[in-house]
Amino acid sequence: IDGEIDAGSSTGSVSSILPALNDAFSDATSVGLILKMNSPGGSPVQSAIVNDEINRLRKLHPNKPVYVVVEDMCASGCYYIAAAADRIYVSQASIVGSIGVLMSSFGFTGLMDKLGIERRLMTAGENKGLMDPFSPYSAKHKEFTQAMLKEIHEQFIAAVRVGRGKRLKENPEIFSGLFWTGSHAITLGLADGLGTVDSVARDVLKAEDVIDYTVREGLSDRVLKKFGAAVGEGAARALGNEWLKPR
C-alpha cells in the first residue's frame, strides 16, 4: 500500500488490495505474507473492509502469518489495516499512529456578511445543507457531526485493541490522534520491532524468495479509468441539464 487509502487508489483500495491478499494466501508455496505499507491513511470504510478481510483470511489459513512492514509512514487508516497483522515492523524514524477521525470544511459566512453576499440554499430535508460552507454551522449540526466521528473512532479503537491485544500499553494518548516515531511506537505496543521487507522475509519467515502479489494497473487501465470517469461526469451533467428543462 503506497499513498492514500481511497476507493480510486491503484494500490490503496479494496479492489486492489483484496485480490492481492487472496492470491498470496491461496498460493500453496507461500509461507507467510508481508504487507509493505507507506500511507498517511484515508477512507475508514476501505480500511475497515481490508482489516476484516485480513482477519478472515488469517482464520482460514492459520499457518500463514501476516507481517506488516512500515516504511516512511503508517498513520490513521493505514494503521487501521496494519492492526490486523500478527506483527508490525517499523524503521526507527517511521511515523506511526494517528488513531483518530477527522472531517474538515471551511466557513465563509463572516466574509459573506462583510461583502453583502446572501446565500440562497433550498433543500428538501431540514438537514440536507449540513456542512455547507456558505451557511451558518448550527450547534445541532455540530453535535450530530461530532457524534458520528466518535462512533467511527470507537470502531477504529476496537479494531486496534483486538489486533494488538495485551501488547498495547494503557496510555490515553494512543487513541488521541497523536503519532510517534517507529522507535516510540514499539514502546507503546503499536509496533513489535525494527525491520524491513528483506529482513523480515529472511530472518522471521526464513523465506528464500519474495514474490510480489501487488495488483498493478497497466497504462490501458489508467486511460480507461480516466476516460470512463470523464464520460460519466459528462453524461451526468448532460442528463442533469436535460431534467431541469421545462416541459
Where are these regions (language model features)?
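N-terminal organellar transit peptides
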Residues: 1-68, 72-76, 85-91, 102-247
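Alpha-helical bundle segments that constitute or directly flank the non-heme di-iron/ferroxidase center
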Residues: 79
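Extracytoplasmic ligand-binding site segments that recognize negatively charged/polar headgroups
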Residues: 98
